[in-house]
Amino acid sequence: MEIRRNEKNHAFETLIDGKKSHLDYEIQEEGGVKKILFTHTFVAPEHRGKGVAAALTEAGLKYARENGYEIVPLCSYVAAYLDRRPQD
């Protein structure tokens, strides 16, 4: 599954069988601290339960860590993912 970061739409996206799934984010900087706020995850209904949301989340977390962002999981899926995998 290919996931790309769409800077214009502030999302990590994948296209499967012509259906787009995405993890939305916002970037903020407060007091010199860079933050990435993961705000919403959407997976096309026919692709749910197949690891798409996890793959999008993993891509977003990897990007955040590689670029020195503090992670703020506003999206319930991302928050639950981090609770299940505290090392991620």
Task: Give the label of every model feature segment.
Residues 49-62:
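Conserved acetyl-CoA-binding loop-helix of GNAT-fold acetyltransferases
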Residues 41-48:
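A short, internal acetyl-CoA/4′-phosphopantetheine-binding micro-motif in the GNAT/acyltransferase core
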Residues 12, 17-34:
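A conserved beta-strand-loop-helix scaffold within acyl/acetyltransferase catalytic domains
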Residues 1-11:
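Active-site rim helix/loop that mediates acceptor-substrate recognition in acyltransferases
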Residues 22, 65, 73-88:
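Conserved active-site alpha-helix within GNAT-family acetyltransferase domains
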